[in-house]
Each structure stands twice: as C-alpha cells, then as structure tokens.
Amino acid sequence: MYFITSNEGKFREVREMASKYGIEIEWLKMEYIEPQGSSLEEIARLSAEMLAEKVEGEFVIEDSGLFVEALKGFPGPYSSYVFKTIGNEGILKLMEGVENRKAYFMAVVAYFDGKEVRTFTGKVEGEISREMRGTQGFGYDPIFLYGNKTFAEMATEEKNQVSHRRKAFEEFFRWLKENKI
C-alpha cells in the first residue's frame, strides 16, 4: 500500500507506526493540488477521490491541521498554506499578549481500497508555546506544547506515543487488520 505525501517526515513517522502492525507502507512522493474544503475530513476525502483517478491500487493519505482556540480554530484546514506563508513566527506573532493558549492538532487519514474512501480521525490537545522550542519534527512542532515539552523537543518515538497522526493511523491500522488483512 502506498502512503502519498510529499513530506518525508510524515512518511518516516507513519512507516514506523505501520511496522508495529506488520503493515508495509511504501512512499509515493507526489505533489498534488489540495482541494479547498471547510474541514480536514472534506479535504482528505476530496484529495483521495482525486488521486484515485491517477494512482492504481490502494493508498492512504493524511491531512492534518493546527487549531488555535483564541484564533477561532485558525489556521485549521488552511494549516499547510499558513505555515508556508507566515510559519511558526506568524502564529506566535498573532498570539502575542493572548492568555488563552489552548490548541489542538487534528489528523484525518483517508484510505482508498480501490473502490471507496474511508476516513479515520485523531486529535491531541495542547497549547501554543510562547517561543519556538526544539529541533525535532517538522511544521508546527516547535510551537505546540504537550505537557511541558513542545513536539519538537520530543524524540520521534515519544511524539508518536501521543500524536494526532498516531491516533488516526492506529485507528486505521486496527480497522485494516480486522477488515482487510
């Protein structure tokens, strides 16, 4: 089965999780224009349907986002674009002087089995830090606090124990084991 992503960090994270279930995942590095949608689930589903016309066989994709309570859920489904334009520095700037730092990461995995698309969701609650911390991970990891550490201060294995991506992929891997393998 392919995992379609242009993000090598995501692929490594998911391959490590899949191996614990005895599932082999191959990386299909592919750029694609992500459709716009009002939710991660809608974007993941539309992306999978679009890719199903180009990719033979079964595959999985994942879309994730950072949702900041004080910013009314922003950047949410626009997380990738926002990261490319204003990055972590921009989010920290928007949060200057804001006391409510609550945020969560959400991930939606969309699996295409050759016929239909199924989605699986994972979520992890945390806060936005006051400065960037850590060098591990990617994306918003340096500003997402889980307990007393940012995701970027955690080793991959530690982050994988609690991450939104892990929760979504574990739900998927369990379903796959019960229904397909």
Swiss-Prot record:
Give the residues the record marks as binding Mg(2+): E34, D63
Binding site residues for substrate: T5, S6, N7, E8, G9, K10, S64, F138, G139, Y140, D141, K159, H164, R165
Q: Which residues form the active site?
A: D63
GO aspect biological process, one term: nucleotide metabolic process
Which keywords accompany this UniProt record? Answer: Hydrolase, Magnesium, Metal-binding, Nucleotide metabolism, Nucleotide-binding
Q: Which cofactor does it need?
A: Mg(2+)
Which InterPro entries would you find in this protein's record?
dITP/XTP_pyrophosphatase, ITPase-like_fam, RdgB/HAM1
Question: What does the UniProt cofactor note say?
Answer: Binds 1 Mg(2+) ion per subunit.
Reactions that this protein is recorded to catalyse: XTP + H2O = XMP + diphosphate + H(+); dITP + H2O = dIMP + diphosphate + H(+); ITP + H2O = IMP + diphosphate + H(+)
* One cellular component term from this protein's GO annotations in UniProt: cytoplasm
- SUPFAM superfamilies hit by this protein: ITPase-like (SSF52972)
What is this enzyme's EC?
Answer: 3.6.1.66
Q: Keyword Metal-binding: yes or no?
A: yes
Family annotation (Pfam families):
Ham1p_like
Query: What is the enzyme's class at the highest EC level?
Result: hydrolase
Report whether Metal-binding shows up as a keyword of the record: yes
The record's subunit annotation is: Homodimer.
The name on file for this protein is: dITP/XTP pyrophosphatase
Q: Which organism is it from?
A: Archaeoglobus fulgidus (strain ATCC 49558 / DSM 4304 / JCM 9628 / NBRC 100126 / VC-16)
